[in-house]
């Protein structure tokens, strides 16, 4: 279903987008798509400080563009006064490529000249200072996961199935929104969002050691990973 936003360069438009993203990670669906790119290109970065949800989403999409690009199709989105995003987003080209033409005019500049004694001494001092500082604890990354949980048959109590799934507690695991999706022949599956701390939770182990063992396997037949995105 297509989504429409008013002028995102105005406070009213940003207020509307901020409220929309309160319970969503992406503009449409459960993974980054062209819809996110359309809105991303219309949002003025300098105005995000007052909009917590827009700022969170903007930084996430910006990181995806730098790392791997965005190619999801999306459901369609319209931003008043803004042109649609290109078909497939790719990571930004390196600065060296963007300035290749200018380099032709700088043949007389020695870009790779030898370091002076002063530069070497300064580099050594910086290295010594860095070595003297205590190592900072590396922050663990997080991922957003969309999981399909399938029952045994149409007689499975889906309410109890969801209660069983939500009873799973593990450090670094946060369960989010869920919904029942018809599969066919009267059978429904549970689709549930979750956020995991990468260093603490393995989705494969979560499925094998928690969701498909007793007593939960009384309701759960199998689980499939539908989407997995770094946050």
From Swiss-Prot:
Basic and acidic residues bias: start-end ranges: 118-127
Annotated signal peptide: none
Keywords of the record: Elongation factor, Protein biosynthesis
Any one of the GO CC terms: cytosol
Record's function text: EF-1-beta and EF-1-beta' stimulate the exchange of GDP bound to EF-1-alpha to GTP.
Family membership: Belongs to the EF-1-beta/EF-1-delta family.
Protein name per Swiss-Prot or TrEMBL: Elongation factor 1-delta
Taxonomic classification: Eukaryota, Viridiplantae, Streptophyta, Embryophyta, Tracheophyta
């Amino acid at each position: 279903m297509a989504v429409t936003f008013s002028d995102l360069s105005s406070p009213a438009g940003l207020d509307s987008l901020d409220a929309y993203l309160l319970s969503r990670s992406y503009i449409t669906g459960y993974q980054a798509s062209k819809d996110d790119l359309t809105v991303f290109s219309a949002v003025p970065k300098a105005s995000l400080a007052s909009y917590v949800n827009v700022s969170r989403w903007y930084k996430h999409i910006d990181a995806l563009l730098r790392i791997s690009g965005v190619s999801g199709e999306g459901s369609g989105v319209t931003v008043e006064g803004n042109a649609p995003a290109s078909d497939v987003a790719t990571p930004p080209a390196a600065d060296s490529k963007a300035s290749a033409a200018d380099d032709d005019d700088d043949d007389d500049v020695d870009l790779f000249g030898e370091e002076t004694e002063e530069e070497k001494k300064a580099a050594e001092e910086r290295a010594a200072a860095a070595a003297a500082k205590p190592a900072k604890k590396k922050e663990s990354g997080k991922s957003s996961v969309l999981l399909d949980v399938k029952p045994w048959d149409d007689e499975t109590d889906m309410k109890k199935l969801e209660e069983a799934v939500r009873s799973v507690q593990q450090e670094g695991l946060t369960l989010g929104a869920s919904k029942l999706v018809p599969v066919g022949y009267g059978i429904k599956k549970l689709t549930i969002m979750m956020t995991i701390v990468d260093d603490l939770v393995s989705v494969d182990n979560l499925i094998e050691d928690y969701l498909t063992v007793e007593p939960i396997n009384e309701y759960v037949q199998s689980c499939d990973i539908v989407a997995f995105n770094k946050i």
